[in-house]
Structure formats: structure tokens, C-alpha cells
UniProtKB/Swiss-Prot annotation:
The gene is matK. It comes from Torreya californica. InterPro entries: Domain_X, Maturase_MatK, Maturase_MatK_N. This is Maturase K. One of its GO terms (cellular component) is chloroplast. Keywords: Chloroplast, mRNA processing, Plastid, RNA-binding, tRNA processing.
Length: 495
């Protein structure tokens, strides 16, 4: 992989014009084959897997047949590509997909790096919680939030047109078109939605195609937003008499009282902030409702004309910041008006200024967490505990560790919420299924388990986490103070 990137750095032309020869390099298929072996859970010897699964000669023959086949794609011929490729699917389907993914990832990484260098202010971060400080700092200065769901139902031809912007050699595009039409069921809306929620290794190519598509959208959208932000409108008033406007404007000093009420002011400073995680995007805007509606109108036409994709109107919701709550990354984001009184003393004069700001109040969805626990059979929908009979075959330490990690993940992720009391209620609900599971395993009662375990019932690592948090912050601060964890990349709940 490093060798390919070094070669691409020295010779940038190959990533745009000569991708096709990379399909005939054996070391590339060795990398792809190693990827498949690493994630394979089979206990067969490696020699048997290689002989039965992978044949580089078969892959070469496949690519040669695809190149010579004039009607290999169902859209332009009468042949059935599924019958054409199913005969040897077990021998080369995974290596071809893995090799295609490796080639596209290397070329795309170099292109996105060049784009990030040219775009000032563009930041790509991995931590989930790094988004919330940005929202807390920037969004309160806005009036509206545009909640966008990025379309994930993508036709293969749209992806091919997207890749044509940075891949110029025709053989690679033909091979890519054939593969996309053949595996189009893997890139359907349902499969992509599942892959975005629960990423899997076998959806690597699907996730790459979707991310590259979103990246292409953002590469056009973000510069347009930055241009709109920099083009600030100047203030001007509505004059009742516009006759000889150029001559009269120099002599106007102040408006009469009866006209000042009709004065119309345009927006002077436009604030636009864009945040995306997964298939959800938030655009915070400061302006009038008409300007926000125009922004949504332009987004519709942006997707329609640039990417030949019709987006449903319900995918872009306009929310007024002070009246509506937005559900984003597991939080209910609400902005409340917070009045501030500022006193400034200059010599003998005392000035008092009233300021009104918006404060972010992230709320953890206790009801949704409770429904999730009920779905996973920890309790019913009313919160009554249920024992995990499938865990009774585990040791006591494993059972305690699993419940402990679930509780830690919840407190770790929702550390920025203002309703900590609800999290302690969830912890109490998890405490009872843990004791009930241990009681079912040892054929005893919950009272006996709690008397034997005492305060050590899945609280060891929890108290270690609390000690770390308390040592990081001053003791004079409130226990209800919110904080964000910048080390959260993905929450893996052991259920």
C-alpha cells in the first residue's frame, strides 16, 4: 500500500489516467487476498483456502473476457451478467472486489488529501464527540438549522459519472461499470443503510462508494457555502421616493419617524456552518426564513443538476433554533435563550448592558435507551428487569464485565447531557437484570446475590471511570457540568 502511494506521489498521472494496469499486478491481489483471509473465520489451512478460493490466472481471464465482451453490461446488451459471472463467483468475486477497492482507495486518498490542502478551514475528525463542541460554539449564533439526510439510494450510472471526474482511462471505467451493475443489489438503499449503522467488512466497497459520492457532493457544496459566507450584503434602507435616487441619497441624513418603522434591512453578516456524520448533515444559518428557504431550494437543484439525483423534500427540514429540537448522534439538541447582564464601569460612569444568547442543552433520550434495552431483553417497555438467560453459561466475572461495559459506554457517550439523573435511572435498571441473571445461574434469589456481591455488583470499572473524571476536573465544579470525550470513535456495546 505504501509503495503504491509513493509511486502515485512521484507520478501523479497514473491515478487519473492509468488505473487499469494495476488490475494486472499480482502483489495487489495478494494484498486483497490477505484482507479476505484476515477477516475469514474459517479454520481450514491457508493452503487449502488459496487453492480452492483464489486463482490469479482466473482473475486475468475474467478481466480479459470483460474487456473483449461487447455486450457484457445488461443496460447495453441482451446477455445476463449474473449468469455470465456466477459460474466462477466463488473463485474470483472477492479478490476482484478487494483489488478494486484497494485501487480506488489509494487514488481517492491522494485526491482527497490534495483537496484538503487547498481548502482552508476544512477539518475531518474521527471522534464523534468532537462535533459537539463545534455545535456548542458556532450554532448558538445562528437562527435556523437545516437538517439534511444525505441520499443513500444511488444508481450505478451516477457513481460512474462521479468517477469520470477524476478517472480518465476508459478500460477502468468499463470494468467499474460492469462490477457496479453486477453487484448493484449490494449498493441498494437498504444494504447501505445497514452498513452505515453497523459497518461490516464485507460492505467495504459499498461504504467506500457511498463516502466517495458524499465527498464529491461536499467538494462542490462547501466552496459554494464559503462563497456565500464571504459575499456579505451591505446595509441599506427602503426609500419612499426613488426619483433621482443617486442625487438624493447624498443629502439624506436621518429618516423621518413615520418612515423608520418601514425600514427594511438586509443581512450584513452571514454565518454558515456545516457538520456531517454518517448520513446526517446539519447546516446552521443566520438569516431570515426566506433566505433559508432559498438555501433549501438551491440544495434541491444542486443534487438534481450536478448529480442527476432527485431528493425528496422531507429530507431537508428547516428548524428554527429557539423553537425546535434536533435529534443528532443520539442527542436531542435544544437551544434555550440565556439572558446575561454585563456591567462596565468607566471612570465614574456605570454602563449596564443586557445580552441575550443561545445556550446548547444536549439531552440524552432516556425513553429511546429504555426501548433499546427492552428490545435486547434486559427489561420490558415499562422498565421491569428481565434476566439474560443466554448469558447464564458464562462465568460470573464475564457477566459482571458485560453489564459493566454497557453502563460505562452509556455514561461515557452521554457525558455531555444535562439530564444525568436519567442515566442513573438506566444504571439502576441494568443493575437488577445483572443480579437476576446471576440468581438464575446459581438458582438463588436476587437478595442473596446482592448480599454476597454487595457494592461490587458491576461497579469496579465504573468507579475507576468516575475517579478519572473527578481527578481531571476541579472539585469546586458542579457534578452536573457537561464534558465531551474526544477519544470516542465507535461505541461497541457487548450485547
Amino acid at each position: 500500500m505504501d509503495e503504491f502511494q509513493r509511486d502515485g506521489t512521484n507520478h501523479r498521472s497514473w491515478q487519473q489516467f492509468f488505473l487499469y494496469p494495476l488490475f494486472f499486478r499480482e502483489d495487489l491481489y495478494a494484498i486483497a487476498h490477505d484482507h479476505h483471509l484476515d477477516r475469514s473465520s474459517s479454520s481450514e489451512p491457508i493452503e487449502i483456502l488459496i487453492s480452492n478460493y483464489f486463482s490469479f490466472l482466473t482473475v486475468k481471464r475474467l478481466i480479459r473476457r470483460i474487456r473483449q465482451q461487447n455486450d457484457s453490461i445488461g443496460l447495453f446488451g441482451n446477455c445476463d451478467p449474473i449468469q455470465f459471472i456466477d459460474r466462477n463467483r466463488n473463485s474470483y468475486s472477492e479478490p476482484v472486489l478487494e483489488a478494486l477497492t484497494v485501487i480506488l482507495e489509494v487514488s481517492f486518498a491522494m485526491r482527497s488529501k490534495h483537496f484538503a490542502e487547498t481548502m482552508s478551514g476544512w477539518k475531518s475528525i474521527r471522534s464523534i464527540h468532537c462535533i459537539f463542541p463545534l455545535i456548542e460554539d458556532k450554532f448558538p449564533h445562528s437562527n435556523y438549522i437545516s437538517d439534511i439526510r444525505v441520499p443513500y439510494s444511488i444508481h450505478p450510472e451516477i457513481l460512474v459519472r462521479t468517477f469520470r471526474r477524476w478517472i480518465r482511462d476508459t478500460p477502468s471505467l468499463h470494468l467499474l461499470r460492469f462490477i457496479l451493475h453486477e453487484w448493484r443489489n449490494s449498493f441498494s438503499a437498504e444494504n447501505l443503510q445497514k452498513a452505515l449503522v453497523v459497518p461490516r467488512e464485507n460492505m467495504r466497497l459499498s461504504l467506500f462508494l457511498w463516502n466517495s459520492y458524499v465527498y464529491e457532493c461536499e467538494s462542490f457544496l462547501v466552496p459554494l457555502l464559503k462563497r456565500f459566507y464571504r459575499s456579505r450584503s451591505l446595509l441599506y434602507g427602503s426609500f419612499p421616493n426613488r426619483t433621482h435616487f443617486d442625487r438624493k441619497i447624498k443629502h439624506i441624513v436621518i429618516f423621518p419617524i413615520n418612515i423608520s418603522t418601514k425600514r427594511i434591512w438586509l443581512l450584513k453578516d452571514s454565518f454558515i456552518h456545516y457538520v456531517r456524520y454518517g448520513e446526517r448533515s446539519l447546516i446552521a444559518l443566520k438569516g431570515t426564513h426566506l433566505q433559508v428557504k432559498k438555501c433549501r431550494y438551491h440544495l434541491f437543484h444542486f443534487w438534481q443538476y450536478y448529480f442527476h439525483l432527485w431528493s425528496q423534500p422531507y429530507r431537508i427540514c428547516i428548524l428554527e433554533l429557539s423553537k425546535n429540537d434536533s435529534f443528532f448522534l443520539g442527542y436531542f439538541l435544544s437551544f434555550k435563550i440565556k439572558p446575561l447582564v454585563v456591567r462596565t464601569k468607566m471612570l465614574d460612569d456605570l454602563f449596564i448592558t443586557d445580552l441575550v444568547t443561545n445556550e446548547l442543552n444536549p439531552i440524552s433520550p432516556i425513553r429511546s435507551i429504555l426501548l433499546f434495552l427492552a428490545k435486547e431483553k434486559f427489561c420490558d417497555i415499562s422498565g421491569h428487569p428481565i434476566s439474560k438467560l443466554s448469558w447464564t453459561s458464562l462465568t460470573d466475572d464475564d457477566i459482571l464485565d458485560r453489564f459493566d461495559r454497557i453502563c460505562i459506554n452509556l455514561f461515557h457517550y452521554y457525558s455531555g447531557s444535562i439530564n444525568k439523573d436519567g442515566l442513573y435511572y438506566i444504571k439502576y435498571i441494568l443493575l437488577l437484570p445483572c443480579a437476576k441473571t446471576l440468581a438464575c445461574k446459581h438458582k438463588s434469589t436476587i437478595r442473596v446475590v446482592r448480599e454476597e456481591s454487595g457494592s461490587e455488583l458491576f461497579t469496579k470499572s465504573f468507579f475507576k471511570e468516575q475517579e478519572f473524571i473527578s481527578s481531571s476536573f476541579s472539585k469546586t465544579r458542579s457534578q452536573r457540568e457537561r464534558f465531551w470525550n474526544s477519544d470516542i470513535i465507535q461505541i461497541k456495546c457487548p450485547i
